[in-house]
Each structure stands twice: as C-alpha cells, then as structure tokens.
Amino acid sequence: MSKKLTFQEIILTLQRFWNDQGCMLMQAYDNEKGAGTMSPYTFLRAIGPEPWNAAYVEPSRRPADGRYGENPNRLYQHHQFQVVMKPSPSNIQELYLESLEKLGINPLEHDIRFVEDNWENPSTGSAGLGWEVWLDGMEITQFTYFQQVGGLATSPVTAEVTYGLERLASYIQEVDSVYDIEWADGVKYGEIFIQPEYEHSKYSFEISDQEMLLENFDKFEKEAGRALEEGLVHPAYDYVLKCSHTFNLLDARGAVSVTERAGYIARIRNLARVVAKTFVAERKRLGYPLLDEETRAKLLAEDAE
C-alpha cells in the first residue's frame, strides 16, 4: 500500500501542478481574511483587462466557526488552496480533474460531481456562476466564474478554483478528524493547531472587547477612506480587510443586531467598490502593463475616444 500524502505534500503537489499550467506561485497575504477570494491577488486582479494567473495557500479565519478545537471538522481557521486564472482557460474543469489525479484521486474510480452553487460575497460586492465539487459525497472544492467583483463587471472572465485543504487531506489520509491529519511525517495537524483553535474560539466568543472592536471598525473605515482620497489602493484595501475581520469578530460575539449587521456589510461593500474602481483607474493610468502591446494599444485608443 502506497504512503498517503501529508498535508504539506498535498500543497506541494498542487503548487507544482498549477505552476506547470502557467500560474505564479504567490504567498499568503499578511492580513486576516475570511477566504482566499479576499486576497488582493484575487479581489484586485480579477477586475480590469489584464491577464492574471496565480496560485497560493491562504489561511482563512472565520471567528463564528470556531469550536474550541472540539469539533472534528469546524474550524476558526482553515486553509484554502486558491487558483485564479484570467482569462479562464476553456479546459479549466479538465485541468482541475487532472490535479486530483496528481493527488492520487482517479476521477474514473470516484463519484465526482459538480453541484451548481452560484457564489456571492455581499461584503465585497462580488458574485459569479459557481459549482461545489463533491468527491464521494463530500465537498472539497468551490469552482467560480466571476461575473462581478467590487461592484464591477469582470472582463475577461476570471476562473477561481478553491480547494478546501483540510477536507481534501481528511479524504486522502482517510481520517475522521482534521486534528488527525498528518501535516508532515510524524507531526499531526492537531499538534500544531488545536491550541490556537481553542484560544481563538475563547477570545472570539468570550473575551474580545466589544467596545474596542466597534471603535476599531470606525477607525479602520475612516483610514481606508483617507488612503483612497490619496489614491492609495493597497493600503486602503488592507483597511477594508481589517474592517471585514473586525466585523466578523463582532458578529461572533453577538455584538451586532440583524439590522446593524446589514449596515456593517454595506459599509464594507461601499469601501470595496471604491477600492476596485480606483485600482482599475490606476492600472489604466499605468497603461495596463501586463497586457501585450497590441491589446494595450487598442484598449487605450478606445478609452481615449
């Protein structure tokens, strides 16, 4: 019987595969976020006309999902392997199935289903056509063709493939609890993450200072606005991410009502939309440097008319 891939070997296998498909291997972005989609490597690069192919691991924090390390499959923080390709290759689904084969999962020997699940992120004004990928009855991946990001229509269309690494590893290693996953030879997932899971859950549900978080949200929102007034897209977006994580902490604490919740989401969305518009305008000002010369000249000429 062949040795099962460790968690880090799964990551390395996916990195090698998508590198061979022309993706840049980016590193996780150093700001809290609820999903890999919120990284600037996806959110910003999915808009505008320039091509973009990238793959990266993104630790994703969802305070309300914390379970003190007691639930085998529900986590405060999990890991996503994110692939974004713009324009979307016509064979992206075939490439995805090929990536599963590299992980030792033969699509012909398993029940792999693409279940329609159109995606929406209200806090960033983003939406797209999507599918969940189910492997023998368990969701392991989200597939999305972005139609709108930051309130802007996407053209060309960006394809996003988001692997849930913990679920994938649980399946490959045949374990029932994420904490029993082998991260590396001789080191289990729980030996690294169960204590942080407990502590972050306790903080999110019991200890966090609600007044401080409410004040921080207002300050982060204001600072994002100040940065945008100066045309500073990336610092502004960092503060949008901080607003989002702060809201998630408030939500986990039960500190916002249903009505207030909608208001906070709208405030984050409004900022994200301004960031998106400012980013596209800045790329245009720079002459769309990632485009080939012919396409760049054509687009800039059209914009000048």
From Swiss-Prot:
InterPro entries listed in its UniProt record: aa-tRNA-synth_II/BPL/LPL, Gly-tRNA-synth_heterodimer, Gly-tRNA_ligase_asu
Catalyzed reactions: tRNA(Gly) + glycine + ATP = glycyl-tRNA(Gly) + AMP + diphosphate
GO biological process, one term: glycyl-tRNA aminoacylation
Record keywords: Aminoacyl-tRNA synthetase, ATP-binding, Cytoplasm, Ligase, Nucleotide-binding, Protein biosynthesis
Localization terms from the record: Cytoplasm
HAMAP family the record matches: Gly_tRNA_synth_alpha
Entry similarity comment: Belongs to the class-II aminoacyl-tRNA synthetase family.
Protein's name in the database: Glycine--tRNA ligase alpha subunit
Organism, scientific name: Streptococcus pneumoniae (strain Hungary19A-6)
